[in-house]
């Protein structure tokens, strides 16, 4: 059983603030949770293989390949107007002023 003092310490560590009348309820709930965890700890799982997924499907692996991800040239090919050349050089979109 978790005491009120332990419950207050846990609440403080979790940065929770409880009224005094709630601390007893909190300690009871924590005790119940700890009892459930203790029951789970008693289960013998030595011969059970750990799950990596809840489904039986296997993840298909693929070879890692290095590809060029610099799409800026394609992107800036769409820039038109007087600022197109400068936009391609500095790799920025040049727009009219929108905030005064």
Curated annotation (Swiss-Prot):
This is Glutamyl-tRNA(Gln) amidotransferase subunit C. One of its GO terms (molecular function) is ATP binding. Transmembrane segments: none annotated. It comes from Rickettsia prowazekii (strain Madrid E). Belongs to the GatC family. It comes from the Bacteria. Signal peptide: none annotated. It catalyses: L-glutamyl-tRNA(Gln) + L-glutamine + ATP + H2O = L-glutaminyl-tRNA(Gln) + L-glutamate + ADP + phosphate + H(+); L-aspartyl-tRNA(Asn) + L-glutamine + ATP + H2O = L-asparaginyl-tRNA(Asn) + L-glutamate + ADP + phosphate + 2 H(+). Heterotrimer of A, B and C subunits. Keywords: ATP-binding, Ligase, Nucleotide-binding, Protein biosynthesis. One of its GO terms (biological process) is translation. Its EC number is 6.3.5.-. Allows the formation of correctly charged Asn-tRNA(Asn) or Gln-tRNA(Gln) through the transamidation of misacylated Asp-tRNA(Asn) or Glu-tRNA(Gln) in organisms which lack either or both of asparaginyl-tRNA or glutaminyl-tRNA synthetases. The reaction takes place in the presence of glutamine and ATP through an activated phospho-Asp-tRNA(Asn) or phospho-Glu-tRNA(Gln).
